[in-house]
């Protein structure tokens, strides 16, 4: 199990605290420092069962500068979104937990973190 976090994020800190409280075996990836490649983002999207626009923080200043709210949300624009996430990792929703069964969740609630633990 791996968790992608931004240590400044309260939801990330809460998720890590819950994983620790449950005695989970996991690794931490500080994705703003250890930036995921486009291929890694594609892999995590497959595991999440989501599209890149589903995990994009559209309210971030960088998202507004890029104009992502105006981008198409279909197969033709998928690579554009993934490239933006790789080049601007601050736009990636967090925390993302990759579960041992090959799936992943966006762990913004205790329930989502527990769901990842149960997989």
UniProtKB/Swiss-Prot annotation:
SUPFAM superfamilies: Thioredoxin-like (SSF52833). InterPro entries: Arsenate_reductase, Arsenate_reductase-like, Thioredoxin-like_sf. Disulfide bonds join 9-12. Pfam families: ArsC. Gene3D superfamilies: Glutaredoxin (3.40.30.10). PROSITE patterns: ARSC. Keywords: Disulfide bond, Oxidoreductase, Redox-active center. GO terms for molecular function: arsenate reductase (glutaredoxin) activity. Belongs to the ArsC family. This is Uncharacterized protein in glnII region.
